[in-house]
Design a protein with these regions (language model features):
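Amphipathic alpha-helical interface elements
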Residues: 1-141, 148-178
Length: 178
């Protein structure tokens, strides 16, 4: 697949998130009945909201792992400069120090994206209510870590970080984008 084809797949994931959010906000009776029917067919314990933890996790994985690997960003330093600028423009705050624990210092977007990507790709994500705890631990090599480094963020923060990475990737692929 080309970079643009990969990006279009990730764009569909973003479309799904935005569409589900809009549908959930509409709240028509027919839609509620449809959700209830699917819920019962799948035997899910509690009826989920259209936008739920899996929605955010799926979009994060598609963007931060699959799309990232598919397009192979050549100049990562330039990417992270653009990501920081886009985050600032979107008024996306970097996670506070109290949200991060462990041996590793996570002080910039490059380190943050690395932690998220590693945790997502290795399945080291814990979900507690509306929050995600991402864990990453270097167990091999010269910089082996005794304890994992964790990041505790809300679903909204994860969505905003993922979308900011998404649009920054778009800017790399199509330089005249948003």
């Amino acid at each position: 697949m080309t970079q643009n084809e990969c990006f279009q797949i990730a764009k569909l994931a973003l479309f799904n998130v935005k569409l589900l959010n809009e549908l959930e906000n509409i709240g028509h009776e027919e839609l509620k009945n449809l959700i209830k029917d699917v819920h019962e067919k799948l035997s899910i314990e509690q009826q989920p909201a259209l936008i739920n933890q899996s929605t955010y996790l799926q979009f994060a994985y598609v963007t931060l792992v699959w799309l990232w690997e598919s397009i192979n960003i050549k100049d990562k330093d330039d990417f992270f400069i653009k990501l920081k600028a886009r985050a600032h423009k979107r008024e996306l705050a970097f996670p506070d120090a109290h949200q991060i624990s462990g041996e590793r210092v996570i002080s910039d977007w490059k380190m943050l994206v690395s932690l998220l990507r590693n945790a997502l790709s290795q399945g080291n994500v814990e979900i507690i209510n509306e929050a995600f705890i991402f864990s990453d631990q270097k167990k091999f090599g010269k910089r082996k870590e005794i304890v994992p480094t964790t990041l505790n963020i809300s679903a909204t923060e994860l969505a905003n970080i993922s979308e900011t990475v998404f649009w920054t990737i778009n800017e790399i692929i199509v330089p005249t984008s948003k």
